[in-house]
Amino acid sequence: MRRVEHWVRQPGPESRHSLHWLAIAVSFALLLTWSEGLTQTYGLLRDPVEVVKKYVSLDQRGIRLESISWETIRPYVNWKEEPSWGHVMVTVGYKIVDDIKQWEVISMMEVLIPVEYQVLGAVYLEAPGFLPEKQVERVKFRVKAVGGRWRIIEPLLPPHVGQKRMINYVRQAMLQELEPSRLAILTALRDELQKAK
């Protein structure tokens, strides 16, 4: 019995200290892995069209109208920052082609997914105004595997916001506007957006 005790290492202050740091390192690694999983769940086992659906849906709801919302779309795209746009495309709908036969497959890790926007026109932000330009805009979103997740690589388009959301955005600006001449411009813009078909 004495021989066995001789070979068993007794816990001392050094081993407790090492164990403490090991526990902290493991906890930190788990926390990082867990938080990355929360911010983006579009791993390579999922369908790449899901990233496009989520991004286009958020854009339609006006998430890109405010720069503070950048963190919301960051998990879906590969660009580092959202540029400031001088205009916003106003839409009445969109259609995402989710049939893989209609995609352009570049490789196993890269595809082009078509989206059709029903555009009413554009709202220019500097001197608020609506330029009607009814059209169907066809865009191919390049989705690629980046860091083990699907990300939109391009195109970097101006915001494509739904008509109702854009009207509400202008209404909110009207409530915050104190200058009468600017309020008149925003009122005219709201009226134009409401009439657009």
Where are these regions (language model features)?
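Short, well-ordered alpha-helical segments enriched in acidic and aromatic residues
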Residues: V51, Y55-H87
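Low-complexity, intrinsically disordered terminal/linker segments enriched in charged
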Residues: L44, P48, V52, V56, ...
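Bacterial Sec-dependent signal peptides at the C-terminal "C-region" and cleavage site
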Residues: L32-Y42
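Bacterial N-terminal signal peptides
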Residues: A23-T33
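Surface-exposed, charged secondary-structure patches
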Residues: Q40-L44, P83-V136, I185-K197
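N-terminal secretory signal peptides that target proteins for export/translocation
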Residues: M1-R16
